[in-house]
């Protein structure tokens, strides 16, 4: 079933976008460039190849790290500024 948008949810989405854009539009990486501690602690149980979906990946620190581990990663985030930084981090790391 398709979701019906109402003006309230659209306003909420726009304010959320503004909030995340404000967070990620700065030059520095809000959470750094290294992966989340929990994700990194799971390295031993990750497959050596395959696909991964990094949802709400922000500036890409987790998705890029997963790609460095040999996975084919799709990284998604709500913020265009975060997506831009994620692509830059991936280029910097060669993945």
Predicted regions and their residues:
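S-adenosyl-L-methionine
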Residues: 91-95
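Residue-level preference for short coil/turn positions at secondary-structure junctions
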Residues: 48-49, 69
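Conserved SAM/SAH-binding beta-strand->alpha-helix loop
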Residues: 79-81
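Conserved class I S-adenosyl-L-methionine
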Residues: 2-47, 49-58
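Conserved SAM-binding motif I beta-strand of class I
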Residues: 72-77
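Conserved SAM-binding loop of SAM-dependent methyltransferases across substrates and taxa
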Residues: 59-71
């Amino acid at each position: 079933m398709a979701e019906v948008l109402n003006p309230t949810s659209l306003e909420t989405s726009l304010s959320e976008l503004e909030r995340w854009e404000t967070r990620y539009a700065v030059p520095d990486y809000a959470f750094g460039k290294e992966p989340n501690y929990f994700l990194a602690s799971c390295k031993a149980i990750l497959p050596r190849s395959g696909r991964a979906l990094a949802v709400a990946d922000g500036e890409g620190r987790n998705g890029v790290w997963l790609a460095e581990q040999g996975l084919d990663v799709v990284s998604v985030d709500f913020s265009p500024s975060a997506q831009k930084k994620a692509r830059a981090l991936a280029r910097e790391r060669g993945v």
